[in-house]
């Protein structure tokens, strides 16, 4: 069973931001979600309220997110989470027949 410092479920803006923050702090990350990121971001015609990216299209924002996580060498694991078990000081994460700890 693989052990991680942190498991993040979801590849929307909040999940990616959490993954970047954890990576900068040299944590071993399990980022679970779609490698295509959030469809909601890409569908946005124009995003007006994202700091540093004024009036950006959702498609351009998605590309900026993808470029940033690639530069930081963050891997997205495309597995469905079935169950999360509290295990005292860590959590067990079941993904099909696989388990991980974080």
Features from the language model and the residues they span:
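Short Gly/charged-rich anion-binding patches and loops
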Residues: 17, 36, 64
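Gly/Ser/Thr-rich beta-alpha loop segments that engage phosphate groups in nucleotides
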Residues: 12-17, 60
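Core beta-strand elements of the Rossmann-like FAD/NAD(P) dinucleotide-binding domain
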Residues: 2-4, 95-102
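Beta1/beta-strand and adjacent pyrophosphate-binding region of the FAD-binding site
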Residues: 1-14
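Flexible, glycine-rich phosphate/dinucleotide-binding loops
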Residues: 15, 38, 56
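Glycine-rich FAD pyrophosphate-binding loop
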Residues: 7-9, 24-43
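N-terminal Rossmann-like dinucleotide/flavin-binding domain of flavoprotein oxidoreductases
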Residues: 42-99
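Gly/Ala-rich phosphate-binding loop of Rossmann-like dinucleotide-binding domains
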Residues: 19, 23
């Amino acid at each position: 069973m693989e052990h991680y410092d942190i498991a993040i479920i979801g590849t929307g803006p909040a999940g990616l931001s959490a993954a970047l923050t954890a990576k900068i702090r040299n944590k071993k990350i399990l980022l679970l979600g779609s490698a295509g990121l959030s469809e909601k971001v890409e569908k946005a015609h124009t995003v007006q309220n994202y700091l540093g990216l004024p009036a950006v299209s959702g498609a351009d924002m998605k590309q900026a997110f993808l470029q940033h996580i690639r530069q930081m060498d963050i891997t997205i694991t495309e597995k469905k989470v079935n169950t999360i078990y509290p295990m005292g000081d860590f959590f067990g994460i079941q993904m099909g027949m696989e388990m991980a700890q974080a």
